[in-house]
């Protein structure tokens, strides 16, 4: 079952504990293989350098799409490709962001052996449905009573 989410832009989702910045979308990595993203000229997307932990604005380019690597790809490559840690700054102005989430089927096993990686596996091997269910728990939209 697929779900759609529209975020309320009238108030921040949270304030970053790292630097006190108001966020329209909390700091996270995407769950899937990759995300292809169109963002309008309002921007707001930031990516984090995994070594310095500094944040960098992703500039708007009308002729380009943004590609974020996801956590499932990190698992499949046994960490050789890292998921992109990112966030969206809070802005009350209307902002258009259109993501396409490239994800495997729910029964796909996230196993590095699919890519001929057999040694020193660093991640738990599971099917994508269980992996996704656990990954989505970090988002406020999914934090509601059963």
Task: Label every model-predicted segment.
Residues 7-44, 50:
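Short catalytic-site patches enriched in acidic/histidine residues
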Residues 1-6:
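Short, small-residue-biased leader/transition segments that mark boundaries at the very start
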Residues 22, 38-134, 142-144:
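Catalytic core of Fe(II)/2-oxoglutarate
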């Amino acid at each position: 079952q697929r779900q759609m989410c529209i975020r309320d832009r009238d108030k921040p989702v949270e304030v970053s504990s790292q630097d006190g910045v108001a966020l329209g979308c909390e700091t996270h990595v995407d769950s899937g293989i990759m995300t292809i993203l169109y963002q309008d000229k309002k921007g707001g997307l930031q990516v984090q350098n995994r070594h310095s932990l500094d944040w960098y604005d992703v500039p708007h380019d009308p002729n380009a799409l943004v590609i974020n690597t996801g956590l499932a790809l990190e698992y499949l490559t046994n960490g050789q490709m890292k998921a992109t840690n990112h966030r969206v700054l809070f802005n009350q102005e209307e902002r258009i962001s259109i993501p396409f989430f490239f994800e495997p089927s729910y029964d796909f096993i996230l196993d590095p052996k699919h890519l001929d990686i057999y040694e020193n596996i660093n991640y738990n091997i599971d099917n994508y449905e269980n992996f996704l269910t656990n990954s989505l728990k970090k988002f406020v939209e999914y934090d509601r009573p059963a």
